[in-house]
Amino acid sequence: MTFNICVLISGNGTNLQAIIDAIESKYLNVCIKVVISNKETAYGLERAKKASIETRVFSLQKYLKQDPINNTRSTYGLELAKIIREYSSIDLIVLAGWMIILPATFLKEFTDNKPTIDIINLHPALPGQYPGAHAIERAFNDFKENKIKHSGIMIHKVIEEVDAGEVILTKEIPILPTDTLESLEERFHQQEHKSLVESIKLLSTK
């Protein structure tokens, strides 16, 4: 039985490409049913199209413009969940560079209603360290102040608290004296691709 996933992206789609490559090489026995982006210009959509994967664009900005006063993010979350529910056989939702914090309305659709669907995210920090944005830069600054010698990445299940859900996989990444922020970010990205693919493999074969 094929394990079906939905991938949410916001940008270049390098993590998406890593998943596509792992499927094409037969390392992953999964099917990407749909790639959804909140940005029409996201290059990851082109990567999906080249691999003959269905794509959808669902922008938050439209909701903010229509009703900037009320809680439009909650409405956006509900509507996004409805789109994913159109694909009745989804087994896993993967956030691969998705830059919008998902509201509780979205998360509860997949935790409170059947069938439940796990949602996983990649965060460039170890559990309990550097939640939120700019995690690599914050780790690099702490390294320069001799506060840490390494950082890392984790793949975790998504809950309402940012970057705090059940951990699926972690990978420690040393910070070298010769590192620049750019070289450290590159090493992080290389490991992110591997770890995201490995996490999908773990969940699809359990």
Swiss-Prot record:
Family (UniProt): Belongs to the GART family.
One CC-aspect GO term: cytoplasm
Pathway annotation: Purine metabolism; IMP biosynthesis via de novo pathway; N(2)-formyl-N(1)-(5-phospho-D-ribosyl)glycinamide from N(1)-(5-phospho-D-ribosyl)glycinamide (10-formyl THF route): step 1/1
Pfam families listed in its UniProt record: Formyl_trans_N
GO molecular function term, any single one: phosphoribosylglycinamide formyltransferase activity
Signal peptide bounds: none
Protein name: Phosphoribosylglycinamide formyltransferase
Membrane-spanning ranges: none
Reactions that this protein is recorded to catalyse: N(1)-(5-phospho-beta-D-ribosyl)glycinamide + (6R)-10-formyltetrahydrofolate = N(2)-formyl-N(1)-(5-phospho-beta-D-ribosyl)glycinamide + (6S)-5,6,7,8-tetrahydrofolate + H(+)
Residues binding (6R)-10-formyltetrahydrofolate, per UniProt: 99-102, 121, 163
PROSITE patterns: GART (PS00373)
GO BP terms, alphabetized: 'de novo' IMP biosynthetic process; adenine biosynthetic process; purine nucleotide biosynthetic process
Organism expressing this protein natively: Dictyostelium discoideum
Site (Raises pKa of active site His): 163
EC number: 2.1.2.2
Keywords: Purine biosynthesis, Transferase
Binding residues for N(1)-(5-phospho-beta-D-ribosyl)glycinamide: 13-15, 192
Active site: 123 (proton donor)
Database matches in PANTHER family: PHOSPHORIBOSYLGLYCINAMIDE FORMYLTRANSFERASE
The organism's place on the tree of life at top rank: Eukaryota
CDD domains: FMT_core_GART (cd08645)
